[in-house]
């Protein structure tokens, strides 16, 4: 792949309302938390000497009305699943969000996921979801979707973040962007190899057809063609 070509990545954040998805995105883009801009934002950086343009999409509160459209999910390259460490319901809802993504065709073997537990800065006694519970969920999800998949699924990485203390926000985004980037490269190479194989197969088929056509022509016609050519 041309290192000078800009690679576009679409990263979406999903999770229950109020877990801090918008604030996480604003911190990543270094935007004031009071900024009411919704939709998506773009950030550019370099991964392995490749220029990458990352588009991050926010649900903008639509999840409250179960109204996320297919356009929100369309062509996403990576997913950040979010919950709040002080909200058990948001953790339990992760399965529903994962199923929602799969409903739109974004299977774990096609699109990388990471898990983010936000509000980690809260005093420990307010934590109802600990690190082990989150990591166990990640392991279970991998085993659950490994069935019927012909390749090893990547581990789902878990990050504990804080928008107040700026803990692990950049690390989480760099992680999912790198996974999405590497996955996109693999897909591009796979398509290129498939196209090359198809072209080679088509060429072989064309050659075989030409040989078959030649062999099926009666001898006298071959001779006539040769004489016609020679005596033109």
From Swiss-Prot:
It is found in: Cell membrane. It is a lipid-anchor. It holds the Pfam family Ras. GO terms for cellular component: endomembrane system; plasma membrane. GO terms for molecular function: GTP binding; GTPase activity. Transmembrane segments: none annotated. Coiled coil: none annotated. Gene3D superfamilies: P-loop containing nucleotide triphosphate hydrolases. A motif (Effector region) lies at residues 35-40. Its main location: membrane. PROSITE patterns: RAB. A lipid is attached at residues 229-230 (S-geranylgeranyl cysteine). GO terms for biological process: endocytosis; intracellular protein transport. Keywords: Cell membrane, GTP-binding, Lipoprotein, Membrane, Nucleotide-binding, Prenylation. The keyword GTP-binding applies. InterPro entries: P-loop_NTPase, Small_GTP-bd, Small_GTPase. GTP binds at residues 15-22, 58-62, 118-121. Belongs to the small GTPase superfamily. Rab family. PANTHER family: RAB FAMILY, RAS-RELATED PROTEIN RAB-7A. NCBIfam families: small_GTP. This is Ras-related protein RabP.
